[in-house]
């Protein structure tokens, strides 16, 4: 189980139980839309479904209840809320297994990659704005909902992209020659 998985083989241990890539993408999606409906994406064991297939028995996450997203709904949100809402829960609850999940370096890289991919495709500004404008065109002309959602997403997109580490550093104890670490071994 995920409860018993730990140590250097953590990823291998859970990969047979859960679809790690799907979970990473699900968490990235829910983080981007900033779901404030209590669910696994924000560290609460509520309002989500699990799916286990026959051919692929790894557990997949299925979202539902989207009435508190993009800064809308009955729960205050800020576009600059954490990109790790599953472990920095706004309601003060935590699920220890998610701390371990996001602490794995391979999963963390996948999560960052999924955030960037979704923000540069599905949530890319022109695509997202058109989707919102076309989907909410039934609202009264004096409604600010479309503008509010678009504005929120602009802020959220910028904030998330700014949180994803982009620098790559390497350190070494090799001897230096002409400013580069070198070895003959």
Question: Where is each model-derived feature located?
Answer:
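Catalytic-core segments of enzymes that bind and process phosphorylated/nucleotide-bearing substrates
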Residues: 1-184
